[in-house]
From Swiss-Prot:
Its main location: membrane. Keywords: ATP-binding, Cell inner membrane, Cell membrane, Ion transport, Membrane, Nucleotide-binding, Potassium, Potassium transport, Transmembrane, Transmembrane helix, Transport. One of its GO terms (cellular component) is plasma membrane. It comes from Escherichia coli O6:H1 (strain CFT073 / ATCC 700928 / UPEC). This is Potassium-transporting ATPase KdpC subunit. Belongs to the KdpC family. GO terms for molecular function: ATP binding; P-type potassium transmembrane transporter activity. The keyword Transmembrane helix applies. Pfam families: KdpC (PF02669). The gene is kdpC.
């Protein structure tokens, strides 16, 4: 009975710290220092949320740039089902998926002359990635230009405008946020 009081007081102290003080403190600091990120990095147009800068969307029309395939089950880019496909490189099912994706991309992009960029046929580890390389976006220019009656030069400039350099120059590669790029495309039509 003697050891019960210190154990109970330690339990209550840790419960208060880890269940109350720490979550409230991190929430307050996050809202204070990083309000945009703490609230989901939402892209807004007026009062309307158009997407998140961190999660891809399923753009399927010919007038949009397409991102990486989503690995989430049931519905593409579902953040509640985040996770990779977990198919090994040696798995024949992965080969079938990639072959089907390449065939679909070739059919949708008949004017593209080079090989299909790898990130357009392979899902990311989270299954929610919204970034592709500027080269993968440029590969899709003929299809988007034709669907939107825009010039190749206009789309090349738009890709360059929305390309982001890596945080450290020699680590990583430039990327294009597909959600932001496609929203910019929609603004061109207005």
């Amino acid at each position: 009975m003697r050891g019960l009081r210190p154990a109970l007081s330690t339990f209550l102290f840790l419960l208060l710290i880890t269940g109350g003080v720490y979550p409230l403190l991190t929430t307050a600091l996050g809202q204070w220092w990083f309000p945009w990120q703490a609230n989901g990095s939402l892209i807004r147009e007026g009062d309307t949320v158009r997407g998140s800068a961190l999660i891809g969307q399923n753009f399927t029309g010919n007038g949009y740039f397409h991102g990486r395939p989503s690995a989430t089950a049931e519905m593409p880019y579902n953040p509640q089902a985040s996770g990779g496909s977990n198919l090994a490189v040696s798995n024949p099912e992965l080969d079938k998926q990639i072959a089907a994706r390449v065939a679909a991309l070739r059919a949708a992009n008949p004017d593209a002359s080079t090989n299909v960029p790898v990130e357009l046929v392979t899902a990311s580890a989270s299954g929610l990635d919204n970034n592709i390389t500027p080269q993968a976006a440029a590969w899709q220019i003929p299809r988007v230009a034709k669907a939107r009656n825009l010039s190749v030069e206009q789309l090349t400039q738009l890709i360059a405008k929305y390309s982001q350099q890596p945080l450290v120059k020699y680590i990583g590669q430039p990327v294009v946020n597909i959600v932001e790029l496609n929203l910019a495309l929609d603004k061109l039509d207005e």
